[in-house]
């Protein structure tokens, strides 16, 4: 150690530059080597090549330094090696290229590829240990593979990242670096060391508060699974709820969530206790169903062996199962009956006769529907043409249509006549109002003319003018009326106006 220190101290002054260059090369190799270790990244080959170049440069610098220490007499030993003389410009990347490659690295790809490799190789265990044990027991007993039969449920469990690996998952904002500095007018060239450390500390605080990528992926998988179970997509899949239940785990993990989702009641008719909540009753009465007894399953019909079944009840049941049809439906039935056989017509006639017998025996009022459904139309019940032959029924319906058309035309004519009468009455009233308005205008013009004549006559009247007085009398009269409101000349003229009103004054003596 002492020899080395003496040798280094005895080295020429230019060895300081060599020490600085070697230190820079070692620092660059130490900084770049952690980033290029995962070769599974997108540009892993380029980063590996860059690391190899830097390592060779570092080894060469160390060897050159040893050579300089061993032989200090050579005049060329003090020259600093130039990288441009040893490498071509394409082999040694610049700092900007290194930074660009570092920024282009996807931080998620290495983790995702590693997780996919673990899932493919089978070394990665999902969160549900009880589910895996149950599946292994099922496969050991000769059961089928779970992934092929129920791909919609267990695939989500395999894709989900376990809780133990969540802390190693990168944050969702980890790939956002210092690009936000441009918004404040500063660029990456103008940033100082203090600014960079401040931005890094702020980014670290944000990344610590932000959720991680694994949390986001697990939440998306849970939402997808819940949506599939909500739309009843996975109810036809095999039910592994008994296998997925883990008695040791008390926390609601993914397997328990899927188990609760698969326990949703459905109408598939499976013999599970939970399926009786939404399953409709098996016995559907004809009151709620528009179909007859012939279209219902055999289990819903009563057998003659039942104790509560007798001939009268049978007739009532048959009568209730006959639906109600209006005239339009009967016209459609006529067309279908034209192509049917005579046996069907006889059967329908027998059913109608049985229905009439039942209505007579029960004592229902006339016009009330017998099938249990409320009557349509004008309160009448079942159509009376149901018991007729097709030709007779057609003629009856045509006669009804003709009578209805006549009544409609008559009612329409009456409404039209009533409307025309109202129009004529309104026209007469309008003419009367116009005549009254014209008379009112004539009277107004006559009043204005008479008022103008009266005003003109009053202005020409001389009865209010008195006898002319002498100068002394006029002066004395003016002196007496000086303190009054009006002068004597105004009073003599007879046109004195008090508050805008024309008043006739008495004659002066």
Swiss-Prot record:
Biased composition (Polar residues): 283-303
InterPro entries, per the entry: bZIP (IPR004827), bZIP_sf (IPR046347), bZIP_transcription_factors (IPR051027)
Name the UniProt record assigns to this protein: Transcription factor atf-7
Subcellular location: Nucleus; Chromosome
Residue numbers spanned by region Disordered: 283-318, 337-400
Region Basic motif: start-end pairs: 393-413
Listed Basic and acidic residues bias regions: 308-318, 390-400
Compositionally biased tracts (Low complexity): 337-364
Alphabetical keyword list: Chromosome, Nucleus, Transcription, Transcription regulation
Domain (bZIP) ranges: 391-464
A single Gene Ontology CC term: nucleus
GO-annotated molecular function: cAMP response element binding; DNA-binding transcription factor activity; DNA-binding transcription factor activity, RNA polymerase II-specific; mitogen-activated protein kinase binding; RNA polymerase II cis-regulatory region sequence-specific DNA binding
Function: Transcription factor which regulates the transcription of various genes, including those involved in innate immunity and oxidative stress responses. Binds to promoter regions of genes, probably at 5'-[GACGTCA]-3' consensus sequences. Together with transcription factor daf-19, involved in regulation of the serotonergic response of ADF neurons to pathogenic food. Modulates response to infection by the Gram-negative bacterium P.aeruginosa, acting downstream of the p38 signal transduction pathway effector serine/threonine kinase pmk-1.
GO biological process: antibacterial innate immune response; cellular response to metal ion; cellular response to reactive oxygen species; defense response to Gram-negative bacterium; negative regulation of innate immune response; negative regulation of transcription by RNA polymerase II; positive regulation of innate immune response; positive regulation of transcription by RNA polymerase II
Signal peptide span: none
Effect of a null allele: RNAi-mediated knockdown increases susceptibility to infection by the Gram-negative bacterium P.aeruginosa. Up-regulates expression of metallothionein mtl-1.
Family label: Belongs to the bZIP family.
Tissue: Expressed in intestinal cells.
Classification via Pfam families: bZIP_2
Region named Leucine-zipper: 419-450
SUPFAM superfamilies named in the record: Leucine zipper domain (SSF57959)
Subunit architecture: Interacts with serine/threonine kinase pmk-1; perhaps in a manner dependent on dual specificity protein kinase sek-1.
């Amino acid at each position: 150690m002492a020899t080395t220190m003496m040798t280094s101290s005895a080295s020429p002054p230019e060895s300081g530059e060599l020490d600085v260059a070697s230190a820079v090369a070692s620092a660059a190799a130490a900084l770049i080597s952690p980033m290029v270790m995962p070769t599974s990244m997108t540009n892993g080959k380029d980063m590996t090549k860059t690391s190899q170049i830097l390592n060779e440069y570092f080894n060469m610098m160390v060897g050159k330094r040893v050579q300089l220490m061993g032989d200090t007499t050579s005049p060329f030993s003090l020259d600093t090696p130039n990288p441009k003389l040893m490498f071509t410009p394409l082999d040694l990347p610049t700092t900007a290229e290194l930074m660009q490659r570092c920024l282009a690295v996807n931080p998620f790809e290495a983790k995702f590829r590693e997780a996919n490799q673990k899932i493919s190789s089978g070394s990665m265990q999902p969160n549900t240990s009880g589910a895996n044990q149950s599946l292994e027991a099922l496969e050991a007993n000769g059961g089928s593979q779970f992934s092929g039969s129920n791909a919609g449920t267990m695939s989500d469990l395999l894709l989900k990242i376990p809780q133990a690996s969540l802390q190693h998952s990168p944050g969702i904002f980890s790939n956002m670096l210092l690009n936000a500095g441009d918004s404040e007018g500063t660029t990456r060239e103008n940033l100082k060391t203090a600014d960079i450390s401040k931005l890094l500390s702020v980014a670290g605080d944000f990344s610590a508060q932000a959720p991680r990528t694994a949390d986001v992926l697990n939440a998306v998988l849970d939402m997808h699974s819940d949506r599939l179970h909500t739309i009843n997509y996975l109810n036809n899949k095999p039910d592994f709820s008994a296998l997925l239940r883990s008695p040791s785990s008390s926390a609601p993990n993914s397997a328990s969530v899927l188990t609760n989702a698969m326990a949703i009641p459905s109408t598939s008719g499976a013999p599970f206790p939970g399926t009786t909540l939404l399953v409709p009753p098996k016995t559907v009465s004809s009151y709620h169903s528009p179909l007859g007894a012939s279209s219902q399953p055999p289990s819903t019909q009563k057998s003659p062996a039942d104790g509560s079944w007798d001939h009268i009840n049978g007739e009532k049941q048959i009568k209730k199962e006959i639906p109600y049809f209006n005239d339009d439906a009967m016209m459609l039935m006529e067309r279908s009956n034209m192509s049917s056989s005579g046996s069907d017509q006889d059967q329908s006639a027998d059913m109608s006769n049985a229905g009439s017998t039942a209505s007579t025996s029960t004592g229902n009022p006339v016009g009330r529907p017998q099938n249990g459904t409320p009557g349509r139309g004008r309160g009448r019940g079942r159509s009376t043409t149901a018991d007729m032959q097709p030709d007779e029924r057609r003629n009856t319906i045509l006669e009804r249509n003709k009578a209805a058309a006549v009544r409609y035309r008559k009612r329409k004519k009456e409404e039209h006549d009533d409307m025309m009468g109202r129009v004529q009455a309104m026209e007469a009233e309008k003419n009367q109002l116009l005549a009254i308005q014209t008379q009112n205008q004539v009277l107004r013009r006559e009043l204005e003319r008479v008022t103008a004549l009266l005003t003109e006559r009053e202005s020409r009247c001389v009865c209010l003018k008195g006898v002319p007085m002498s100068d002394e009398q006029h002066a004395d009269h003016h002196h007496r009326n000086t303190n009054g409101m009006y002068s004597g000349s105004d009073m003599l003229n007879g046109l004195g106006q008090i508050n805008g009103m024309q008043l006739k004054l008495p004659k002066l003596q």
